[in-house]
UniProtKB/Swiss-Prot annotation:
Lipid-conjugated positions (S-diacylglycerol cysteine): C27
General function of this protein: Regulator of peptidoglycan synthesis that is essential for the function of penicillin-binding protein 1A (PBP1a).
Membrane topology of the entry: Lipid-anchor
A cellular-component GO term for this protein: periplasmic side of cell outer membrane
GO molecular function (one): enzyme regulator activity
Signal peptide per UniProt: 1-26
Name the UniProt record assigns to this protein: Penicillin-binding protein activator LpoA
Pfam family, one: LppC
Similarity comment: family membership: Belongs to the LpoA family.
Species, as recorded: Edwardsiella piscicida
Gene Ontology biological-process entries: peptidoglycan biosynthetic process; regulation of cell shape
Organism domain of life: Bacteria
Family annotation (InterPro entries): LpoA, Peripla_BP_I, TPR-like_helical_dom_sf
Gene for this chain: lpoA
């Protein structure tokens, strides 16, 4: 109860002391209108507001407003001003201000793309002394400082961040981001991780990743494993809020292949391609490719082909069809003249493909279904929208095709409920939930070569390419993939006709490994997000390759590489440590021992069917395709189109899902562009052996 003590005025009136105190407080409140600075809370106002408050504040709170202004400047992308203001902070700061100074310093270093400096600052911060809002920023800074490289510190930051998020949408996004980071780890990475005994949440995440990697090739087993995991780890946030990628798997429904519309050009120059694709597709549908056995060693004949190939080794290949890529058709990577029949490497068994752990990938055999209804539609006779409408009305559940690039480009503007496996790829791929793209092209092979050469530790490649549109396309594809892997600029050197190459030989100069950088459009820079603030990254010029060339990727026919390889040796020596790589365009299976000895050390790629993965299936192919490299590749593409159609839902919804096909180990990227990992072979002492 308030005291009844009063003050008597001259007029005799009584004024309560409480009222007097209230009036005094009101008067004193007019002295300063600056509110206290919430330095440990969120900074949601503009930098101008905080700077104004800083100017009007007393010495006690001025540093608080200064720190808030720095955060606002970072949010607004004004890095120089933020750095200047950070440098103007007084040397005498309170403990709370010192913590905020270190945290905002780390955020500034991240915005400057100096992650190592940011990490050094963050490791000195005591998280327990931070407010909840500061802890949220701290863990987001740890994640951003990882620069997309998955580390234990980054994963722990995601886990610690989860309970600090208040909105369902934020929690879901963080779980998806946690899973995306974990998904980049290989089984070898997992086996090398050491965690603390009390890290139950982290252990649950790692176990979830293991069961995903072990079972993703079988959706039914994966579904059962996920449900069992949810029972074993009920306290893990992902147990009740699964990552979107895994939740999609639980609700996965396989695409029906009971009725398929096959869209191909049945007239004109591309008809020969279509015939080979359709033949391979029907062969797989009827079970020819589901009867294959494990790869076996093949005894070598005198000319390097396996004895199991019978008379194929002696058969000559007719001239391949013209490259009509300019007209929009698929462009198989094959030599155009003097090619021999396919053959397996000799002196060694053809190796099965391996996963990231080094274990063999089981073939993803799609059993034949002779009763499946296949309706072929001619894209050269009617517009694509009309054909898709007809296919839908006829009850098609899935479309395979179109083949020509101009038709594939139209898919971006069409709306159809049908699932589509396009047999080519547009220049600019757009992500459509019902479309996947499967292309067999020199560009696709060049991207695989970039990944292979990078994996072998090479960092300064040179491309030796023909002076033609083909060479330009291959160079762009290789360089784009190379830079996406983290490499610098790629050099290119072009050559002309065989006559030009012979004149170079006559000059005795050889081929020196120099060139000009491949020009490609720069990728959009990634932005940096810290505490919900997105800071655009500046455009960075490509990193120049340092040092001498350590790898050469050659796009040449057998006749051309016969001239090129000796000229490289002439100018650079044969024991120079430079890796030589060639595309399937140069593979001459029927070449004699002289050619194989001349190519000593050269690595080259080709599709598994032509690299000897299953000679029995090769024997079953129609003769007109067995004896022509380019058509045989398209025949294999048709067979893989059947397999991919049967795994359409898995490719769209299970990241990392792989299919072992006749054209390579097939997987899909985020836009469902089918990527091929090819087997690599090497000429060694007159034999052809798998690259270990």
């Amino acid at each position: 109860m308030l005291s009844s003590i009063t003050v008597r005025t001259k007029s005799g009136r009584l004024i309560p002391l409480v009222l007097a105190a209230t009036l005094l407080a009101a008067c004193s409140g007019r002295v300063s209108t600056t509110p206290p600075a919430p330095v440990q809370s969120e900074a949601t106002a503009s930098a101008d507001y905080y700077l104004q408050q800083m100017q009007q504040s007393s010495d006690d709170s001025k540093a608080d407003w200064q720190l808030l202004a720095i955060r606002a400047l970072l949010r607004e992308g004004k890095l120089p001003q933020a750095a200047d203001l950070l440098g103007q902070l007084p040397s005498q700061l309170s403990e709370a201000q010192q913590l905020e100074q270190r945290l905002v310093s780390a955020e500034l270093e991240i915005a400057r793309h100096a992650p190592q400096q940011a990490q050094a600052i963050l490791t000195k911060l005591d998280v327990a002394q931070l407010s909840q809002a500061q802890q949220l920023r701290y863990y987001q800074a740890v994640i951003a400082a990882a620069q997309g490289k998955t580390t234990l510190a980054q994963i722990r930051a995601y886990i610690a961040l989860q309970p600090l998020l208040t909105q369902e949408k934020q929690r879901k996004a963080n779980i998806d981001a946690t899973w995306a980071a974990l998904s980049t780890l290989t089984p070898a990475d997992l086996n090398g991780m050491v965690i603390n005994a009390n890290e139950d949440i982290l252990r649950g995440w790692l176990d979830l990743l293991r069961l995903y990697q072990d079972n993703r090739q079988d959706p039914a087993l994966l579904k059962a494993a996920i449900k069992d995991w949810q029972t074993r780890y009920p306290n893990n946030p992902a147990a009740t809020l699964l990552p979107s990628a895994l939740d999609n798997i639980l609700h996965l429904q396989s695409a029906s292949t009971a009725s398929i519309a096959l869209l191909l050009p049945l007239n004109g120059q591309a008809k020969v391609f279509s015939d080979a694709i359709e033949a391979g597709f029907n062969a797989a549908k009827n079970g020819a490719f589901s009867q294959n056995s494990a790869p076996t060693a093949a005894a070598a004949t005198d000319n390097g082909a396996p004895a199991s190939s019978g008379t194929l080794a002696a058969a000559t290949t007719p001239s391949a069809p013209a490259d009509v890529n300019a007209a929009g058709a698929v462009s198989p990577s094959a030599q155009g003249t003097d090619a021999a029949a396919p053959a397996a490497p000799n002196d060694s068994a053809a190796l099965p493909p391996l996963d990231a752990a080094g274990d063999p990938i089981a073939p993803s055999v799609s059993p034949g279904n002779p009763d499946a209804h296949i309706q072929v539609y001619d894209t050269s006779s009617q517009p694509l929208p009309a054909l898709l409408s007809q296919a839908q009305q006829a009850g098609a559940s899935l479309v395979v095709g179109p083949l020509l690039k101009n038709n594939v480009d139209q898919l971006n503007t069409l709306s159809t409920p049908l699932n589509i496996l396009a047999l080519n790829q547009p220049e600019q791929v757009q992500n459509h939930p019902n479309i996947c793209y499967f292309a067999l092209s020199p560009e696709d092979e060049a991207r695989d070569a970039a990944r292979h050469i990078w994996a072998q530790g090479k960092r300064t490649p040179l491309l030796l390419i023909p002076r033609s549109p083909l060479g330009d396309r291959v160079a762009k594809a290789f360089a784009t993939e190379w830079q996406s892997l983290g490499g610098g600029s790629v050099l290119q050197q072009t050559f002309g006709s065989s006559a030009e190459l012979r004149s170079t030989i006559n000059g005795g100069t050889g081929i020196r490994l120099t060139g000009q950088p491949v020009s490609i459009a720069p990728a959009q820079p990634a932005s940096v997000t810290i505490a919900g603030l997105t800071i655009p990254a500046p455009v960075q010029p490509p990193v120049a390759s340092g040092g001498g060339v350590d790898a050469v990727y050659i796009i040449a026919t057998p006749a051309e590489i016969t001239l090129i390889k000796p000229m490289i040796d002439l100018a650079n020596g044969t024991h120079n440590g430079i890796g030589l790589y060639a595309s399937s365009r140069s593979y001459q299976a029927g070449a004699g021992p002289d050619f194989r000895l001349e190519m000593e050390g050269v690595q080259f790629s080709d599709i598994p069917l032509l690299a000897g993965s299953d000679p029995a299936i090769l024997q079953q192919a129609p003769a007109q395709y067995r004896n022509d490299y380019s058509l045989m590749r398209l025949y294999a593409m048709g067979a893989d189109a059947w397999t991919l159609a049967n795994h359409f839902a898995q490719l769209r919804q299970i990241p990392g899902f792989q299919v072992q096909g006749a054209t390579g180990t097939l997987s899909a990227n985020d836009n469902c562009v089918i990527q091929r990992k090819l087997p690599w072979l090497q000429y060694q002492k007159g034999s052809i052996v798998p690259v270990q």
